[in-house]
Amino acid sequence: MSLINLLPQKIEEELRSNSLLKVISGLNNFDAQSVKTIVEAAALGGADLVDIACKPELVDIALKHSELHVCVSSVVPHSFLDSVKAGASLIEIGNYDTFYEKGINFSDEKVLNITKETRDLLPNVPLSVTVPHTMPIDKQVDLALNLVDESVDIIQTEGGTSSSPYSSGIQGFFEKSVPTLAATYAISQEFKKQSVEIPIMSASGLSQVTCPLAISCGASAVGVGSAVNKLDDLISM
């Protein structure tokens, strides 16, 4: 049974209208000032949701300095507990980039085990799970379907770290977005075939140029990270 209806009304409405924008500060970004700046920029820029590292102090900062709803990301199920108590509206297993950089990948079995443990700990909290881009597309689709069976509420795709654009400018934006767009499209098509109504969030490698393509590929939401959080000041963000 989906817990989408337990999300704040605005988030639920944006998901259903395929127009949710999430800004990602990074799973490993525990710098309070950095998170504060990203949250303020996200609020000023019209985002609906901010995705931050799973630490209750950061949840407090996000809620204090904006009216945005908060998603927290981790791969350690027990770490979600205190952040949910602090006011996080959504929990997410994902943002694997820092692990990829260390040569650590996530198998379908590992993702499913983390998901099951998280769901057992927090059965009444909306849960999003990222499908690792390191898997072949057909395996990503299979994992997405298995995650639906585990009562996951949102499926997130990724791919930016696996794509190094050959070109600069606008063409580079398109090249970088290909992995996450391909995964989004493939999962969306299979969901349609099987009448699965779980929303898909397309994230990683997206920019203002390619976010509309994600929606065209079947996403209900988009997540942007480095396009925002690697900038140096509030106005640029």
Describe each region flagged by the PLM.
Residues 2-202, 207-237:
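Alpha/beta enzyme core
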